[in-house]
């Protein structure tokens, strides 16, 4: 689910996926893929990198079950955060490949990834917030998301 807050007028936004009761192999595999996608994007973030370079790391819409980038818009995605929930830069295959923006120190944005499970009805979604430093990115979200969290396990 999407967790959204405001603090002194500034917005936050991050996704976490939970399994309730138990996680199947399909759930864990989807989560692992979503985590790999977001980790590769976070590792790419530093001043001078452009948004098309980040978007190019993500799979095409067809690779994860959608017919077009418009249909999949917002699933492999990045957006600035500030006084608004969705600010620039916008990072997606739909617009960044043709209209890249250079990443600069001080930018604050969220990166979101999604991957469908092979069971036909489940999926995993992860979103992390970060600030661009002089040398890379500092993660702002502290709620753990390295592994799929199972609540009320049985």
Region spans (language model):
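Active-site neighborhoods and metal-handling regions in enzymes and metal-associated proteins
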Residues: 1-154
């Amino acid at each position: 689910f999407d967790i959204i807050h405001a603090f002194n007028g500034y917005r936050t936004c991050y996704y976490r996926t939970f399994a309730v009761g138990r996680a199947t192999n399909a759930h864990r595999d989807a989560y692992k893929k979503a985590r790999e996608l977001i980790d590769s994007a976070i590792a790419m973030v530093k001043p001078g990198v452009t948004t098309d370079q980040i978007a190019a790391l993500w799979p095409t819409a067809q690779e994860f079950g959608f017919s077009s980038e418009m249909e999949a818009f917002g699933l492999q995605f990045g957006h600035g955060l500030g006084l608004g929930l969705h600010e620039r830069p916008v990072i997606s295959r739909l617009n960044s490949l043709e209209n890249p923006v250079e990443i600069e120190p001080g930018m604050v944005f969220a990166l979101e990834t999604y991957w469908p499970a092979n069971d036909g009805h489940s999926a995993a979604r992860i979103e992390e917030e970060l600030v661009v430093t002089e040398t890379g990115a500092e993660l702002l979200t502290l709620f753990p998301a390295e592994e799929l969290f199972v609540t009320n396990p049985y």
